[in-house]
């Protein structure tokens, strides 16, 4: 395994074990945009799938078309996400529907690494729990600041 693959595997471990709190044997649905949209790296979903499978996850790929005006996820997607333990969006749709209640049945992850190099970078392998702790600290500071500011 070369250095790139080691980092990519570490990033997938970070996504699946730290962020998703998954375990080997869990099902993982990877929702990805069809080839030709060129927003996400065309190999990213396969790279993640290969490492997830090697880590013991049962992976299913779910290709979608990008729709800039999406109003609701398809019935097929809702059914697929409902039956998976974890859903990883390697698609802009994840951000478009992340607050919808009809897709809240499982653990959703939205990848902001849009290409293989970003996934296998320091960003991709940075400890997810560390980012969560940083987010909590920043939110607490903002809430304290808002209570002290009078407009």
Label each PLM-derived region with a short phrase.
Residues 5-13, 37, 41, 45, ...:
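Generic structural signal for well-ordered, non-membrane alpha-helical segments
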Residues 23, 54-56, 104-106:
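Short, well-ordered coil/turn elements that cap or connect secondary structure elements
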Residues 27, 58, 108:
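Residues at the starts of beta-strands that form the adenosine-phosphate
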Residues 31-32, 37-72, 77-84, 88-89:
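Membrane helical hairpin/interfacial module
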Residues 50-54, 58, 135-146:
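Alpha/propeptide regions of enzymes that mature by internal proteolysis
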Residues 149-151:
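Conserved small/polar residues in nucleotide/adenosyl-binding loops
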């Amino acid at each position: 395994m070369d250095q790139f693959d080691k980092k990519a595997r570490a990033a997938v471990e970070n996504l699946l074990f730290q962020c998703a709190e998954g375990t080997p044997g869990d099902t993982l649905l990877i929702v990805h945009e069809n080839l030709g949209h060129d927003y996400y790296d065309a190999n990213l979903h396969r790279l993640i799938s290969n490492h997830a499978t090697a880590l013991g996850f049962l992976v299913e790929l779910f290709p979608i078309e990008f729709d800039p005006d999406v109003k609701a996820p398809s019935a097929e997607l809702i059914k697929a996400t409902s039956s998976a333990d974890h859903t990883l969006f390697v698609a802009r749709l994840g951000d478009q529907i992340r607050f919808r209640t009809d897709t809240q049945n499982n653990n959703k992850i939205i990848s902001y690494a849009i290409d293989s190099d970003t996934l296998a970078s320091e960003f991709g392998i940075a400890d997810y729990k560390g980012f969560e702790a940083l987010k909590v600290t920043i939110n607490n500071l903002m809430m304290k600041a808002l209570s002290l500011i009078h407009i």
